[in-house]
Each structure stands twice: as structure tokens, then as C-alpha cells.
Amino acid sequence: MLSLRPYEFWFVTGSQHLYGEEALKQVEEHSRIMVNEWNRDSVFPFPFVFKSVVTTPEEIRRVCLEANASEQCAGVVTWMHTFSPAKMWIGGLLELRKPLLHLHTQFNRDIPWDSIDMDFMNLNQSAHGDREYGFIGARMGVARKVVVGHWEDPEVRERLAKWMRTAVAFAESRNLKVARFGDNMREVAVTEGDKVGAQIQFGWSVNGYGIGDLVQYIRDVSEQKVNELLDEYEELYDIVPAGRQEGPVRESIREQARIELGLKAFLQDGNFTAFTTTFEDLHGMKQLPGLAVQRLMAEGYGFGGEGDWKTAALVRLMKVMADGKGTSFMEDYTYHFEPGNELILGAHMLEVCPTIAATRPRVEVHPLSIGGKEDPARLVFDGGEGAAVNASLIDLGHRFRLIVNEVDAVKPEHDMPKLPVARILWKPRPSLRDSAEAWILAGGAHHTCFSFAVTTEQLQDFAEMAGIECVVINEHTSVSSFKNELKWNEVFWRGR
């Protein structure tokens, strides 16, 4: 997997001097206990760092500026243990540029019925201290996540952990580099977009490179490295019999190994974590990258076909949110309109990530009718089952829109022996008819990122961090209400 920098999350507790030094010592002690307990829980992907109990406007502003300056700090979690007058927070919140989570909790889970007194009441005031803090966030229009519940509750911890992954994806987004090999597929609209606007909005650096640059990297790959990678293929995948002996099929597989090694070297040298290819720009290459792309996605790279750089970047960020699990570039390919069992078959020409596979992938070689190159090797498999999301990022000219459809992947009821690509079947929520109608009304692309591991909540959180629109299609969606939502959003986003 692609490595991430050692991110951390800062925990900042709000209070004030009204209650005396002894109370502040208890607030700090409780905060340290919470952080220590969290850091022992493997559910959290990154460590918490307790920064301080802040009690003055100067302390609050200082810690916010320090968070901005720290490359390790991916987000700030705040909690008001006691009442913390929120005017003190204005200066700091005006400065803060890192993702913010407001944890509405309290140290004790239960009220100590027999011993509760006013000392206890004054110390444990988050029930109204956090409401005061919440007001100033609303008054200032601060983008923040609010999580409510006891800090030891597994559900609360799970929500915190998912937000942490999303915040790290946002941090990675600010430095994400996309390499485009060739241009977009000719005459296609949705894969186009404003690359300068994307860099301003998300931080993405998107640049094009000639196929000849990549071809040279491929040619520089040694036969020893190719042979070592072929051995790895044989350990991980089933390979068609013709691919296990010398001949054209094995040579096709060897070529994909060569492409994988050359492509990976190019990406590593340029610090790219996402890339695109297109079958219309392959001069000097023997095959369209297939198996090579699938394996690089499995390592955490983002990918988009036909020059789709927005989806390539989205795949990379969702890989980060998912910790590399169960996430792939995808395309809505064809429909099954059987009444009561409507399905979508998702696939692509070659490039579906094996992290969503339910079966052991099989390396096969088949002709590709477009691109005019040799028969490419690819991994063929059926996708898994379970709840998932499909997400699409589009450029509407004056803003970006993230569209999310919740789906349920299902096991194929029939074999598809003549279909030479990786594939997955799903039932979109609320139905194929309504989801497709809503998707089309929203302008959703035919390319998506499909994920078993990323949740709708994470994608909504990312949109909030990035300052973009997000619309969700799920079991509660009605097309008439969705149309109104799109109209209301148009007014809101044009007015910002």
C-alpha cells in the first residue's frame, strides 16, 4: 500500500477560570485519560494528541495557529468539559484551516445519583457548554463535524475513526498529484473539467505527460524484475494454462508486468498517487494497461479511464478513506431489467480493482476491440456482496458536485463465461428506475468510484471539508423531492 505521513489528531478541551484551579486540573486529568484510552483502541487509525485545556482567547487562537502550521496534524477535535464562553473561540475559529470535529460528550457516562452535588454539576457542564460552543460555530458558518455520545461508546469511536480517515484523505487531497497519460477520450463531456479550479478547490495538481515518457520507463525495466513479478502473479492469481508456458499468452502477461513496473516507477519518481490512461493515446505501447492498472489500484493508486482525472483523484481519496479496502474505479455498463430483480452490471474495459473481488482473480488474455493494440492481459473475477456506495464527482462550471448512490452488491445468479472482464452486480437504492432518474438529473458521470468500505457519511464529511455540494441517492430518495433539492442547491451555491 502507498504509505501516508504519520498523521495525528489534536484533542483540545475548552473551559474557563471561573471554577478555580482544582476544577481545571480535573478537566485536564479527564482529557488525558480519554486520549490515553482512545490510543489503546485499534479502531482508531491515527493517534490522538492531547494539546491543552484552553481557557482564554489567546490560548485558543494559539493552538489553532499551531494546528495550521503542523504537517502532522490532520484535524482538531474539540470538547467543552465545562462551560467555555464561546466569544473566546471566535479568533481561533477564524484562523483554523484544519478539519474540525466537535465531540459532544462528557467524562462520566452516568449521573451519580447518590452523590451528585453542585461541585459535580459545575465540573460536568458539557450538556450546555457544548451548546454554547455549537452556537458560535453556527453563527460563524464554521464547517465542522458534530458527534454526540459517550466517549467510550463503540459507535461514537467508530464515527470518530471514519472521520479521521476522511480528514486524512482531505490532507492528502491538498498535495495530490495526478499524471495524465494522453488526453481525454475525444468528444466526451463529463471527463472534462477545470483543472485550475480543481487545484484551487481541492489542491490537486493535474498535468499531462506524453506516452513516450512512459514508454521509456517501460523499456528500462529489466527482465529480472519482470520475471520476479511473474512469479508474484502465479502466487496470487489463477493463470490460464496457456499463460503458464512460453507462447503469445505468456508474452502478453509479461508485457503487462513490464507496463506495471514502468508505470509504477514513473509515478514514484514524480510523487503521483493517481493517474489516467486512454485507449486513443497509446503510441509506442504494445497494449492498453489492464492488469498493470488493476494491481496499482490495489496498492492504493487512484485511476480513471479515458483521461478521467476527476475520478482518478476521487478513487485515490476514497482508497485513503477505506484504508485501501474494497474500493475501485467503476462504470455503470449495462442493465438487467427483469421485473422485481432490476440490476446494474458494473465493469470497465479492463480496469476494475481486485480489492472488490469475491473470487480468486484469474489472469486471462483476450482481444480488445478498441485501441488497435495487442491483446491485453487482465484480471477477471466476480465482485463481492454487500452494502456499498457509488460516487461521482462532476464539474458544473461554477462548482463541483459530488453525487453518491447507496447500492447493494449481489452475487450473480448466472455464470458469464464469455465476459472477459472483472465485473460486479448491484441493486441501486431506492430502485434502478428512481436511482438512475435522480443520477441523470444530477448530472452523474458514467465513471464512478465503487466502495464497500467508504460510507455516505464519510463522503458527506469530505464534501463539507472541501466546500463542495454533495447529493445522496438512497432508500429515502423520491425523484420529486430530489428535483427540488437540486433547485435549492443551485440557488444556495450560486449565492455563495
Curated annotation (Swiss-Prot):
EC class (word): isomerase
Pfam families with a match to the protein in the record: AraA_central, AraA_N, Arabinose_Iso_C
This protein's record includes keyword Manganese: yes
Cofactor note: Binds 1 Mn(2+) ion per subunit.
Binding site for Mn(2+): 306, 331, 348, 447
EC number: 5.3.1.4
InterPro entries hit by this protein: Ara_Isoase_C, AraA_central, AraA_N, AraA_N_sf, Fuc/Ara_isomerase_C, Fucose_isomerase_N/cen_sf, Lara_isomerase
One record GO biological process: L-arabinose catabolic process to xylulose 5-phosphate
Requisite cofactors: Mn(2+)
Protein name from the UniProt record: L-arabinose isomerase
Gene designation per UniProt: araA
